[in-house]
Amino acid sequence: DRSGLRSLDRGPGYVERQVGGWIGRYGRARTPDVGDFAATIAWLQANQPVERPPTMIHNDFRFDNLVLDRADPTRIVGVLDWELATVGDPILDLGSGLAYWCQADDPEDVQAIRLQPTNAPGMWTRDQVWTAYADARGITVSPTERLFAEVFGTFRLAGIAQQLHFSLLFALGLLLAFGGQGVQQLARLLEFALAGQDGGPQGLHREIVFSWRDALQPLLG
């Protein structure tokens, strides 16, 4: 209440809302080339833990949202990207962040999607992150709580990736709908719109228009 952020609190049911929300987002973004995650979805719906007392959470807490001290990289001096911040279960927030955390002994297929230097020498394992978090807060995180948080976090990450995949396919579909001839027509319309007083495209505008057209033509046929 003192922070003035009480409006972010939607009340009890945070875990249920998160699970249901990401099931819905994945379903809406699903394309024919991916699975339905039916077993994972059923498990998440059936194994939701008792919620802990809510706290202010970042909701996108991961390594590449941290600012480290240049002189001492083990010291965090800032946390970025608070636009998703809310009031909810911090265990779920940590599990979501650890979905990005590939450690040095993870198998090759996991290493292939690593985006952060979490496998570098000296970096903590996920076990060590959980232990440090529990010790810092003076709490015990049960194995079932941790498992649920990590499964949810991985499913959430799959949902994010699928949303991006869907957006890319949708954008490409719009481009393909124009066809090669459509690109030519759009280029001519742009030329006309950008024409100078002498009736011809100005030099820089002409370069932009034809660079755009030439870049798209190999994709559109």
Q: Where in this protein do the model-derived segments appear?
A:
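A cross-family kinase active-site recognition segment
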Residues: 1-38, 48-55, 84-90
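All-alpha amphipathic helical-bundle segments outside canonical DNA-binding/catalytic cores
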Residues: 9, 141-152
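Active-site acidic catalytic loop and adjacent metal/ATP-binding pocket
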Residues: 42-98
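Active-site activation/catalytic loop segments of kinase-like enzymes and analogous catalytic loops
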Residues: 92-138, 152-168
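Short linear motifs in low-complexity or flexible loops
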Residues: 177, 187, 193-195, 201, ...
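Residues at flexible loop/coil and secondary-structure boundary positions
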Residues: 181, 198-199, 214-215
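Hydrophobic alpha-helical signal/anchor motif
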Residues: 183, 208-209
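Short, intrinsically disordered C-terminal tails of secreted or membrane-associated proteins
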Residues: 216-220
